[in-house]
Swiss-Prot record:
Entry binding sites for ATP: G9, I10, E11, G12, S13, G14, K15, T16
Organism: Syntrophotalea carbinolica (strain DSM 2380 / NBRC 103641 / GraBd1) (Pelobacter carbinolicus)
Official protein name in the record: Thymidylate kinase
GO molecular function, one term: ATP binding
Gene giving rise to this polypeptide: tmk
Catalytic activity as recorded in UniProt: dTMP + ATP = dTDP + ADP
């Protein structure tokens, strides 16, 4: 079954944890699943990821940041995502084009039509069939992300955690605006609650989109 699902959300919304659970559930039903992420997902894009997320690069110009994301995505799509879909796999991607719109467009203030154009250039017709937007208050998510990095889970990828609460609120509101624009594709999932509760909500939405048995 060739199907493309992206998971989006603010920092600390639990995407990385939940994407693994979703993959396990789908694989238990016999589906071939590929988990990947952005920025990154292949060697060239992973090198760009180091530039984009390292906290020492706080001075990175917003336009340079945007172009680096586009470059990483173009390689990622060509090398990983499109081949996996061609092989009939379900692709689960931790962030994709909507993240660029939310972060570089809504939060950084770059021209949204320009960002959309670059997304289209980088991704072509490789668009998610379903996007799961894990939503929670931006201050709670940021606190969770900063705590995670303080414990050493990602000390060299904390550049966005250094941004202000106002920045992260713009990211969240940007995501929600995108969901209002594309309600058929982007499904808002309440990311508050226990891991199992959020996992259940994600499965209900995913199983409905894939016409799979619901429930956990």
């Amino acid at each position: 079954m060739s199907f493309f699902i992206s998971l989006e959300g603010i920092e600390g919304s639990g995407k990385t944890t939940q994407i693994k659970r979703l993959a396990d559930r789908l694989e238990s039903l016999g589906h071939a699943v590929l988990i990947t992420r952005e920025p990154g997902g292949c060697p060239i894009a992973d090198q760009i990821r180091q530039i984009l997320l390292h906290p020492d690069n706080g001075h990175l110009d917003p336009k340079a940041e945007l172009l680096l994301y586009a470059a990483a995505r173009a390689q990622h799509v060509a090398e990983v995502i499109r081949p996996a879909l061609d092989q009939g796999k379900i692709v689960l991607c931790d962030r994709y084009c909507d993240a660029t719109l939310a972060y570089q467009g809504y939060a950084r203030g770059l021209d949204l039509p320009m960002v959309k154009q670059l997304n289209e250039l980088a991704a072509g017709n490789c668009r998610p069939h379903l996007t799961l937007l894990l939503d929670m208050p931006h201050d709670r998510g940021l606190l969770r992300a900063r705590s995670r990095n303080a414990l050493g889970a990602g000390p060299e990828e904390g550049r966005f955690e250094q941004e202000s609460l106002a920045f992260h609120n713009k990211v969240r509101q940007g995501y929600l605006d995108l969901a209002r624009q594309e309600p058929q594709r982007i499904k808002v999932v309440d990311a508050n609650g226990t891991l199992d509760e959020v996992c259940h909500r994600i499965w209900l939405t995913t199983s409905n989109a894939l016409n799979l048995p619901g429930g956990m």
